[in-house]
Amino acid sequence: LFFPASEEDAKTLEFVNSWPSSLPELGFKMRTGIAVDFRETEWLRAEEGENAVPLLWPYNFNGYRIAFPIESKGKPQYLLNTLETQRLQMQKGNYLLLKRFTSKEERKRLQCCLLFEDDYLSFPSISTENHLNYIAKLSGKMGREELYGLFAVLNSSYMDNYFRILNGSTQVNANEINSLPFPSYSDIIKIGREAAALAQLSEAGCDAILEDLASCSSAGRAI
């Protein structure tokens, strides 16, 4: 049960609560990054070397994309690819990454970026550090329109404000994201097509796409 503290909060709740689905119902799920760095130190490497795969951290976020590798003291950029580390690896694919933690001073709680399969063609797999969350498809690989659609929803001010109303914490819990309302699958695809066509991704651009979709839906019901 949510209690809006302002008219803006009330509008946000009405807008997001009109969405009919959840991530699992759409065929996706958010999970927590696999590799806990202090438990896996023997497998982590600062340099690529032979037989290593990318290890992605929140520090690799660069706008809405991943910068890799980066120079970051104490944040090894590679994981050795061995039989023992198969449990820490993910197949290459399209993923939506979100930071698990933000500071109180930061404007956005939901900070996400796009990870494309073809970004890492030279590597057999990737890994994600435990301070990240990632959204993957439950069956098969996520398409680009699906990826852009989920990104636009989570990057919007509507979902960010909704999450703040729901939870005052600076931690983004995977279970909470999995229970949030999302547009229908067909709408996710429509949103994704428009987001992918944007000259430059932005929160305002994502908001505009969602608002246009809501306006079209309302007009359709009124006819």
Predicted regions, residues:
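Short arginine-rich
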Residues: 203
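Short amphipathic coiled-coil heptad-repeat segments
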Residues: 206-223
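Polybasic, glycine- and aromatic-enriched phosphate-binding surface used to engage nucleic acids
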Residues: 4-199, 208-213
